[in-house]
Design a protein with these regions (language model features):
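Residue-level marker of intrinsically disordered, low-complexity segments enriched
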Residues: 1-3, 8-9, 13, 54, ...
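N-terminal first-folded block
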Residues: 2-41
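Short, well-ordered beta-strand segments in beta-rich or mixed alpha/beta enzyme
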Residues: 2-9, 38-67, 105, 109
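Glycine-rich beta-strand-turn "strand-cap" elements at beta-sheet edges
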Residues: 41-49, 76-110
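An amphipathic, aromatic/His-enriched active-site/gating alpha helix that lines ligand/cofactor pockets
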Residues: 24-38, 56-90
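Residue-level signal for secondary-structure boundary sites
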Residues: 14-16, 61, 96
Length: 110
């Protein structure tokens, strides 16, 4: 399993458009890619230029397939001028066995 947090700062004039494009990409990734377990974007409360994305992939191959996908490439090229900074932080799941229980508990809830 590969777990990553993307820390993104967006140009303030582009926040709405960036969030729209990111939302489309996240939905397509989870729907179309079996190895993408989670793409969960969030904006910092009170500071929407600060975006964090929790990304969970089945493995490194799933991640590599994801970044080559047409929807990710469209997202990347469409938002290039909107991103002020990007930091990718690889994480180590402390209890990977509990993760499926979290998603099961969600039971399709929004």
């Amino acid at each position: 399993m590969l777990v990553r947090i993307s820390e993104i700062e967006v140009v303030s004039q582009s926040v709405d458009e960036y969030q729209r494009i990111l939302g489309e990409e996240a939905e397509a990734s989870v729907r179309l890619e079996p190895g993408v377990l989670c793409i969960f974007p969030s904006a910092q409360r009170g500071n929407p230029t600060q975006i964090r994305i929790l990304e969970i992939y089945a493995n490194r191959d799933a991640y590599n397939a994801h970044i080559r996908s047409p929807h990710f490439q469209k997202y990347k090229t469409s938002t290039l001028d909107m991103v002020k900074s990007l930091r990718l932080v690889d994480m180590q799941a402390m209890d990977a066995k509990a993760m499926p229980l979290i998603f099961k508990k969600m039971g399709g809830q929004p």
